[in-house]
Amino acid sequence: MVQTEIQKNFSHMNDMQKQAVFCTEGPLLILAGAGSGKTTVLVNRIAYILQCELCKPWQILAITFTNKAAGELKERICAAVPEGGADIWAATFHSTCARILRRYGDRIGYTSHFTVYGTDDQKKLVKDILKQLNIAEKTLPVKSILSEISKAKDKMLTPEEMRKEAEFDSRKAQIAKVYEIYQTKLKTADAMDFDDMLCNTVKLFETAPDILDYYRNQFKYIMVDEYQDCLLYTSPSPRDRSVSR
């Protein structure tokens, strides 16, 4: 079936939605308010791409931000594309990164069975480190430390880089020290926190260009729902022709 014939299947959409759905080359950014049908456009665009046989289902990566949203997205894709919809990578950033790291984490020093630390695990680890350093929790609350570590990872800062940023800020220098020990203990335990899953995937791609090329070649289309919530390190390069947002 030619593309013009396939496009008739999307007559229920308005002109702007059709324009987005039928755009299959180069970057695409959709700006619209809540409830305007952005996710519907994403699902229909995937359906259109597959109906036109522009790629295989497993060559599409659809990213969203919560497990609930990812589950709903997967359901809507499978309903729109009964054949092959289940093969599309529809997931959160974290689950996508975990999937990649389970396969290739050994390239950066992790086993395929690495542990993911949740909030309780993180708090316990930081408390142990504070005891090790003889720092009272009242002067340096665990919650504040974890918040600062997370902010550092958002900016892809290592403990050493965080220490340099601290300059004459003794409190931040202490947190940088905790951060350093925290990362060492995580690595020794073959563990990561949720921020690490993102950072380590970036690290993997930076240090193993063959793996980056593998996924770059696999995914012909990368679509991100709620793109405005992306951090710098989770933003796909606009130079990649597969990116649509």
Walk through the language-model features, giving the residues of each.
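A basic/glycine-biased coupling hinge at the interface between accessory DNA-binding modules
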Residues: 2-8, 25-28, 36, 47-221, ...
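The Walker A (P-loop) glycine that initiates the GxxxxGKT/S ATP-binding motif of P-loop NTPases
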Residues: 32
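Walker A/P-loop
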Residues: 39
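Hydrophobic alpha-helical segments, chiefly the membrane-spanning helices
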Residues: 244-245
